[in-house]
Swiss-Prot record:
Transmembrane segments: 28-48, 56-76, 93-113, 144-164, 198-218, 239-259, 271-291
Topology, Cytoplasmic side: 49-55, 114-143, 219-238, 292-308
Disulfide topology: C96-C188
Source lineage: Eukaryota, Metazoa, Chordata, Craniata, Vertebrata
GO terms assigned for molecular function: G protein-coupled receptor activity; olfactory receptor activity
Pfam families recorded: 7tm_4 (PF13853)
Membrane topology label: Multi-pass membrane protein
Gene Ontology CC: one annotated term: plasma membrane
Family: Belongs to the G-protein coupled receptor 1 family.
Underlying gene: Or5h19
Protein name, as recorded: Olfactory receptor 5H19
Amino acid sequence: MEKNATLLTEFVLTGLSHQPLWNIPLFLVFLVIYLITIVGNVSLITLIWTDPHLHIPMYLFLGSLAFVDTSISSIVVPKMLLNFFGKSKVITLSECMAQFFLFNISATTECFLLAAMAYDRYVAICKPLLYPVVMTNGLCVWLIALSFVAGIIHALIHEGFLLRLTFCNSNMIHNFYCDIISLLKISCTDTSLNYLIVFIFSGSIQVFTISTILVSYTIILFTILKKKSAKGIKKAFSTCGAHLLSVSLYYGPLLFMYVHPASSEVDDQDMIDSLFYTVIIPVLNPIIYSLRNKQVIDSLAKFLKRNV
């Protein structure tokens, strides 16, 4: 680092658009999406919390996923909305680190929750008689807690290695929130160790959770194909379809960000991918899991009947 270099304590989030003309339309679009996200996920959590019939592992996992999706959206979107009308779009170093830390906890937790949900479906479909014994509420709560603990540990590791960095080359973050790759790009400290940590820990989490999901659903697929009952096959596919769609939507952009070559030309693509799993997926998940779920729809009907 140069002796006369000025250490930066504030950054500028470039955001989604450099055209002021687009600020109001984009603000309105993302405000509506955010409100739908909050209402949808909080409603799902409320239904699961208040209806004793939904106090089973499948819905406890779903409620936890809704909580994490709400967190991801709330960590990123409010600041993004403010920046549509902010002249400077500044975020301090401490705010940036806090945002990344909380986002990392939520994103990592979601990975482990999706893997746990895949295991839950595996036991339910492949070992239905043992399901009440194997997948108890106690085990479910333990898996949920473990997912959050893993998220916190993962975030602490990255945060610890980020704190050793200094920033003096540029204060422009080419994104709408503070993500680790954007921060590493503008550091004037050697970031080789940080990239290695990202590769080892984030890569291991992706490999472990995706492998768990793939193995679970491969076994589920073979089990379904062995079923002679058309009704049983339809029910099994209906049960797993929502989760598979959610997994595909979440891991697709995430994996693409890891495999494409690094260059300045892909900054916009990175931003689109980030937008997908920080804004779009949190609003889609409650819709995906609720629209074709009879128990959730019935519970909603009862709730509205009691309270409206």
